[in-house]
Amino acid sequence: MDTRGVAAAMRPLVLLVAFLCTAAPALDTCPEVKVVGLEGSDKLSILRGCPGLPGAAGPKGEAGASGPKGGQGPPGAPGEPGPPGPKGDRGEKGEPGPKGESWETEQCLTGPRTCKELLTRGHILSGWHTIYLPDCQPLTVLCDMDTDGGGWTVFQRRSDGSVDFYRDWAAYKRGFGSQLGEFWLGNDHIHALTAQGTNELRVDLVDFEGNHQFAKYRSFQVADEAEKYMLVLGAFVEGNAGDSLTSHNNSLFTTKDQDNDQYASNCAVLYQGAWWYNSCHVSNLNGRYLGGSHGSFANGVNWSSGKGYNYSYKVSEMKFRAT
């Protein structure tokens, strides 16, 4: 076949391609002409046209199977609090709890036992304070925080004659007097306090001229009522008043209605006091308050090694301190 015949045969095809290219979009969608068989005697042209316009949407397909559950997303922001709900019903009464310690017991467990302990806790002022006996009973006592280092528990005080010390056994057992002046702490209390550990004794005396005297003893204890409040005294240590108590060591307490001394008569009645008399005394600090020198014999607030049997001191204080 000659080339002119081929050209003539392909002219309509070229025109068709030109038309389709004109109608196709400007994108890379033009028809493609492919000529095959160039080496053979026959030539074959294959024309691939441009894509047609999209057809109408088909009907909606069936829903596919559910996919696997996705992982939990991050928490969202907290929402606004809702309104309060109605008050709930009252619950049932619970079982009672164990009984707690009473206030008094707690105070006893942690409270001071002596004036010296109060001093170590920072109570530096002399005055009346509450301490606790071994049976947890509270007891108000006069603490001397000034004399000889402080920490003394005062159990006897004479100062103005305002209180009568010529009393019976029951009065000396329980104690008597006034916190504002003269008093005896009570033999039961003195026993309970001195039965705890070791205590030293100090006696302070002041005459009507303002002169001070004292006597100290290494240890001091008063036995219980079954032993008639016997005096158990240690050695005399020092003091310008001299020793007028050692001779009363191991003596029983005697009052006007209970005679426990070693004399034929009742020493408490003879010398108008109450004391650890033997036969009868060299000191009588619970005797009559006679205001200094007196003509009667040995019935005043006497300390014989100090100012003798005929001088009644203005001030007498007996006190003990834990050692």
From Swiss-Prot:
Compartment(s) where it occurs, according to its Swiss-Prot or TrEMBL record: Secreted
**Residue spans with biased composition (Pro residues)?**
75-86
Output the Gene3D superfamilies linked to this UniProt entry.
Answer: Gamma Fibrinogen, chain A, domain 1
Q: Where is the Fibrinogen C-terminal domain?
A: 106-323
Cite the InterPro entries for this sequence.
Collagen (IPR008160), Fibrinogen-like_C (IPR036056), Fibrinogen_a/b/g_C_1 (IPR014716), Fibrinogen_a/b/g_C_dom (IPR002181), Fibrinogen_C-term_domain (IPR050373), Fibrinogen_CS (IPR020837)
What is the residue range of the signal peptide feature? 1-26
Look up the record and report any one GO term of the cellular component aspect: collagen-containing extracellular matrix
Q: Where is the composition biased (Low complexity)?
A: 55-66
Residues annotated as glycosylated = N249, N302, N310
Q: Which cysteines are joined by disulfide bonds?
A: C108-C136, C115-C143, C267-C280
Binding of Ca(2+): at which residues? D259, D261, S265
- What is the predominant subcellular site recorded for this chain? secreted
Instruction: Please list the residue ranges that the record marks as compositionally biased, kind Basic and acidic residues.
Output: 87-102
MF (Gene Ontology):
antigen binding; carbohydrate binding; carbohydrate derivative binding; metal ion binding; signaling receptor binding
Keywords tagged on the record:
Calcium, Collagen, Complement activation lectin pathway, Disulfide bond, Glycoprotein, Immunity, Innate immunity, Lectin, Metal-binding, Repeat, Secreted, Signal
**Region of interest (Disordered), residue spans:** 55-107
Question: Which GO BP terms sit in this record?
Answer: complement activation, lectin pathway
Tell me how this protein assembles: Homotrimer. Interacts with elastin. Interacts with MASP1 and MASP2.
Q: According to its record, what is known about the domains?
A: The fibrinogen-like domain (FBG) contains calcium-binding sites that may be involved in carbohydrate binding.
Per the similarity annotation, which family is this? Belongs to the ficolin lectin family.
Name the record gives this protein: Ficolin-2
Q: Per the UniProt entry, what species is this protein from, by scientific name?
A: Sus scrofa (Pig)
Gene of this entry? FCN2
